[in-house]
Amino acid sequence: MLPKSLIRLLIANAVSGVSQGIMMVAVPWYFSNHLKKSEWFGVIYAGATLATLFWSLYAGTLIDKHSRKKIFLWINASGFFFQGFLALAGSIYGDMPWMAASAFVYTMFTFNIHFPSLYAFAQEVSAKQDYARVNSWLEITHQSMSVVSGGIAAILIGGITRGSLLFEVFGVEIVPRPLHEIIALDALTYLLAWMIVQTIEYVPEQERLAEKGSVLERFKQGVRFLLENPGVRTFGWASYVIFILLLIEVHQLLPVYVDRHLQSNGNVYALSEMIYAVGALAAGLWMRKTLKFFHPVKTIMVMMIFTAFLFAGCFVMKSEWYILLFSVLIGVTNAGTRILRVTWLFEHVPNRVIGRVNSVFNAFNILSRTLLGLIFSLKFFNSGGNIRYAYLICGVILLIASVVLLVNMKKIQATTEKA
């Protein structure tokens, strides 16, 4: 049984996560399909990603220094007021690019402290022997909400028209909803999540010492830990690549691929997001029972290689069915990799430095996504069906990261348990 405090936090996370997921689908589609300015979104995404570098470094030290409950209260309170303001502005003046960009960027900044705090809290309130089970449940609940948000997003941004697959399922016509209404829904769920977090009471499994020193000094402690533990460093960076590419694919490449290469509507885009979550959910349920039978590093390497070939398939194929198949399979590989990766790091990184170590890895994530985001925002990739070349590049990068894991396998396996 999961700790009651963690169950309540997961419920709060699920409430706000549904509308966040809807919005993270709606905003990229707004730029690609409604404004026909996918390159604008590419630049916004790259710029926002770079800006989160400094925030994520600071966020990691906050996670290690302050009560994780207080952090979640702050996240949800600020989300309610900020997104509520944007929704109000949209209802008065109509949907505007700056409003869409602000909502998306704010959510990106929120994610950079929300998910590290969630994993740190889970580690803090869980016994060591329960790490794998807890991580599986984190993945299951997160992806369950992604399934729900993807399905709702398909209806909200694409509507339901006569003759469509969704019309056959639901039997009603629904017009697409304006973006400011989606943002308003997001604001309200932040408020509900804040109310749930208020009820959380917990006793940590591990005692944390009060942290001292500046943000830079505490960040250096995370760097120092990785320098002293080369196996953790190499594994953490190389295994992160699959998540970096997934974020780029979901937020920047997929809407352009569906709109320009497949020439399909918003339903296909949103359903791709939903079916990805179905695959991730299946992986979470499957690995919860079978995790002990897997060798973490070798399994991650195999899944990364498999995902590389899936990306290459997007370069070759021009099929709505393939992009749906691609989405469900990368859902499996991404979620499976995340469960194995987080569990491995829980076992090798002490809780007192987990936030700072994750901040260092996140800095690598952010710089990589900024570079790739700028490259893929070039006019070439956003013209006609050229976005498929971006998928080919992603496949090559994944293969290179897999080779890094293979070459350093002995060093990673020799890592002594620190936690």
Placement of each model-derived feature along the sequence:
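Juxtamembrane intracellular "pre-TM" segments in multi-pass secondary transporters
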Residues: 1-6, 202-237
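C-terminal transmembrane bundle of multi-pass solute transporters/carriers
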Residues: 42-48, 53-65, 69-81, 85, ...
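Short hydrophobic/alpha-helical segments at membrane-entry points of transmembrane helices
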Residues: 8-9, 95-103, 235, 321-327
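Intracellular juxtamembrane helix-capping segments at the cytosolic ends
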Residues: 27, 113-126, 336-349
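Cytoplasmic helix-loop-helix junction between adjacent transmembrane helices
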Residues: 103-144
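Transmembrane alpha-helix termini and helix-breaking/packing motifs in multi-pass membrane transporters
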Residues: 29-33, 87-92, 148-183, 260-261, ...
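Helix-loop junctions on the cytosolic side of multi-pass membrane transporters
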Residues: 120, 124, 175-179, 183-213, ...
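A single, central transmembrane helix in multi-pass transporters
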Residues: 164-169, 179-180, 218, 224-284
